[in-house]
């Protein structure tokens, strides 16, 4: 099976973008995994699919598959690339589009400087909405927020980390670290991602605060491992930091792949806004194995 694709990246978070506006490709999880494979396929953190929307007032459907082939609710860096793609391909002439995701409707906006701002919706901190099983745990209050003790491992190797849990349409667990470069992401990231208290698994964020307007962040993404950047992870980390009284309303987030700017008023009823780059890397076509 031969398909055309566009390779894009936003702050180093890289994507294969597929156009299904003229018909479904009908790919299987195994075929998504093949596309994402960096040795045999194109290579990507996620596969993004553009589909027409049947709903009035919605321009497109935005479908996201992780590198493991599983469909997920949201991807912030991908949303910026999605908006850049549909505009560059002439699928819309609008600067602001309304896009349906599994997590709800988002509204990416192309800015005059070439970046893209996305209304990512409001953050949710209720453990049940993340979802996070908080039964039997005592939270530690700080500012208007709270952190939860999360036990990792068992026996002599067990450790407890304090995490703020946030949903940005997908689940996040954010922990504060003194030095993000020294954070044990490769070791504890998988333990947090698959922790039994997160029934849908979770994205694990490691947040270093430099001052009230600047942070550094690494994220071990659910179904993808550590990536160079995670847009929803940046939104979740900043929202958690503001909620805990540690950050101001506008924060520059330095990831290993580049800079994102996150803005949130601190009002739980209001949206988080993310601004960052979206770049086309190359286009091509690839033969992928037919579905069994």
UniProtKB/Swiss-Prot annotation:
Pfam families named among the record's database cross-references = DAP_epimerase
The record's SUPFAM superfamilies line, in alphabetical order, gives: Diaminopimelate epimerase-like
Q: Does the record bear Nucleus in its keywords?
A: no
Q: Cellular component terms, GO, for this chain's entry?
A: cytosol
Task: Give the GO biological process terms.
Answer: lysine biosynthetic process via diaminopimelate
Q: Please give the catalytic activity noted in the UniProt record.
A: (2S,6S)-2,6-diaminopimelate = meso-2,6-diaminopimelate
PANTHER family from the xrefs? DIAMINOPIMELATE EPIMERASE, DIAMINOPIMELATE EPIMERASE, CHLOROPLASTIC
Its function?
Catalyzes the stereoinversion of LL-2,6-diaminopimelate (L,L-DAP) to meso-diaminopimelate (meso-DAP), a precursor of L-lysine and an essential component of the bacterial peptidoglycan.
What name does this protein carry? Diaminopimelate epimerase
Q: Which organism is it from?
A: Paracidovorax citrulli (strain AAC00-1)
**High-level lineage:** Bacteria, Pseudomonadati, Pseudomonadota, Betaproteobacteria, Burkholderiales
């Amino acid at each position: 099976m031969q398909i055309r694709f566009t390779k894009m990246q936003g702050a180093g978070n890289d994507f294969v973008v597929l156009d299904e506006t003229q018909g479904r490709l009908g790919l299987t999880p195994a075929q998504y995994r093949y596309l994402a494979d960096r040795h045999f396929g194109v290579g990507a953190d996620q596969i993004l699919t553009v589909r027409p929307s049947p709903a009035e007032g919605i321009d497109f459907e935005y479908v996201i598959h992780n590198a493991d082939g599983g469909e997920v609710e949201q991807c912030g860096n991908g949303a910026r690339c999605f908006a850049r793609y549909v505009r560059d391909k002439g699928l819309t002439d609008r600067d602001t589009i309304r896009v349906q995701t599994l997590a709800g409707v988002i509204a990416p906006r192309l800015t005059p400087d070439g970046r893209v701002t996305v209304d990512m919706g409001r953050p949710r901190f209720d453990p049940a909405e993340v979802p996070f099983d908080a039964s039997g745990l005592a939270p530690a209050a700080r500012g208007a927020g709270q952190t939860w003790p999360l036990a990792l491992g068992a026996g002599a190797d067990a450790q407890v980390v304090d995490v703020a849990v946030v949903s940005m349409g997908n689940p996040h667990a954010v922990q504060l670290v003194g030095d993000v470069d020294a954070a044990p992401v490769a070791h504890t990231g998988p333990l947090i991602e698959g922790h039994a208290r997160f029934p849908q698994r979770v994205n694990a964020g490691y947040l270093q605060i430099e001052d009230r307007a600047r942070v550094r962040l690494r994220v071990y993404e659910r179904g993808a491992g550590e990536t160079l950047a995670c847009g929803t992870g940046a939104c979740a980390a900043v929202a958690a930091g503001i909620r805990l009284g540690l950050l101001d309303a506008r924060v520059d987030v330095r990831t290993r792949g580049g800079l994102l700017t996150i803005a949130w008023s601190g009002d739980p009823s209001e949206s988080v806004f993310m601004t960052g780059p979206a770049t086309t890397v190359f286009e091509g076509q690839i033969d992928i194995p037919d579905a069994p």
